[in-house]
Structure formats: structure tokens, C-alpha cells
């Protein structure tokens, strides 16, 4: 049977489109995939985050270092100050004793004045010589106990805490001067004098008088 309507209803296989739809092309530089301000904002956020991270980390580690190192430095500083204080006190003592010596001209049997002679002149010269010796010692202590000198060239074992290194090196420098100045002896005398000032009994007062009358220890 002849079907004359095939052309109308399209019973034949469908024909492919003559002009297929082209796939979307890559965006041109004039039409970017993201707004132009996003790269700038990204850089700003990265920079701000970097700075905030540095500030937070620095504050945390600086505080931890301070907490660990301050007690060590304070203890060493007090010990060094004791050494320097003892030397300064001895120097002032020699200065006051030297200035109190008054030279008077000796007189002959006829009453005439002769050249200046004083039985204490030799003692005064000895004190001046001793004062010069202690002054040299004091100046050397100032150099050796300076912060830069005490901790110069600090090197410790790998993995050792910095405060441990500081304490060990500082103790070597300070303890040497403590022995030279006889800090332990001076501290015993000071404790006896403080006990006397506080009026802690007659025995303490007598001990303080004895220690006060005792000669100053020889500084090496």
C-alpha cells in the first residue's frame, strides 16, 4: 500500500541537524572567570594572616623565654651585685680612713718645728697602697661581671635549654669572684651585725661587736 503521507509525518529516520551547537569556548581575557578584585583580596588576606601568625607566635615564645630566663638572670645578678657591693664598701672604707689622717709637724726639744713626721704616716701609705690594689680589683670585676662578658660566646650541647646554658656559664664567672672577695665571710659578718641591730639578745650583740672589731678579710 502506497503511503503518500510519509513525507508529511516524517516516518523516515530523523536527519541530523545541519548546524550543530558549538561547545562554549574558553573565556577571553577581557571576560575573566572571576572578578578582578579577588586576587587582590586574596593577597591581602594572606599577608594579614602571615602577620597575625608571627605576632601570636612571637608573643607566645617571648613570654615563655622570659619566664624561663628571668629567674636565672635575677639570681646571677644578685650574686654579682653582692661582689661589687663588697668591693665598693671596702674602697669607701679606705677612703674615709685615709682622709681622716692629719699630718702634724713634729717639734724639737726647743719647740721649733721640723719636717713633717707622723707616727701614722706609714700606716696611711700602706692603706693608700692597699686601696689602689682594691681599686684595680674592683675595675677588673666590673669588666668580668658585665652582662656581655659573662654570657659571651655562649655555646651549649644540642638540645640543652637556653636557661640551663645561661645558668651554667654565669655561675662559672660569678663563683670565681665570690671566692676572691670572700663573700661567705662578709655575709657572716653582716648577719652578725644585723642581729646586733635588731637587739636579738646580749650574746648576739657581743658577737656583732667581735665581728666588727675583726680586721677585714684579705682580698685575693
Swiss-Prot record:
Bias (Acidic residues): 199-208
Location(s), subcellular: Cytoplasm; Nucleus
Gene Ontology process terms (BP): protein maturation
UniProt biased composition (Pro residues): 21-32
Family statement: Belongs to the YAE1 family.
Alphabetized PANTHER family for the sequence: PROTEIN YAE1 HOMOLOG (PTHR18829:SF0)
Record's protein name: Protein yae1
Species of the source: Aspergillus terreus (strain NIH 2624 / FGSC A1156)
Amino acid at each position: 500500500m502506497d503511503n503518500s503521507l510519509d513525507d508529511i509525518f516524517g516516518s523516515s529516520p530523523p536527519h541530523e541537524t545541519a548546524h550543530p551547537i558549538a561547545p562554549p569556548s574558553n573565556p577571553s581575557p577581557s571576560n575573566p572567570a572571576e572578578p578582578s578584585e579577588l586576587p587582590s583580596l586574596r593577597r591581602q588576606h594572606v599577608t594579614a594572616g602571615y602577620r597575625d601568625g608571627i605576632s601570636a607566635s612571637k608573643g607566645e615564645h617571648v613570654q615563655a623565654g622570659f619566664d624561663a630566663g628571668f629567674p636565672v638572670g635575677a639570681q646571677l645578678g644578685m650574686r654579682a651585685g653582692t661582689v661589687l657591693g663588697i668591693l665598693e664598701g671596702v674602697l669607701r672604707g679606705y677612703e674615709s680612713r685615709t682622709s681622716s689622717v692629719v699630718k702634724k709637724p713634729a717639734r724639737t726639744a726647743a719647740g721649733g718645728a721640723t719636717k713633717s713626721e707622723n707616727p701614722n704616716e706609714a700606716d696611711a701609705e700602706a692603706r693608700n697602697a692597699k686601696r689602689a690594689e682594691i681599686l684595680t680589683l674592683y675595675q677588673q670585676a666590673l669588666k668580668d661581671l658585665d652582662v656581655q662578658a659573662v654570657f659571651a660566646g655562649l655555646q651549649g650541647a644540642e638540645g640543652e635549654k637556653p636557661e640551663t646554658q645561661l645558668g651554667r656559664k654565669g655561675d662559672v664567672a660569678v663563683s670565681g669572684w665570690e671566692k676572691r672577695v670572700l663573700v661567705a665571710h662578709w655575709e657572716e659578718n653582716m648577719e652578725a651585725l644585723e642581729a646586733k641591730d635588731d637587739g636579738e639578745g646580749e650574746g648576739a650583740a657581743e658577737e656583732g661587736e667581735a665581728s666588727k672589731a675583726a680586721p677585714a678579710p684579705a682580698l685575693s
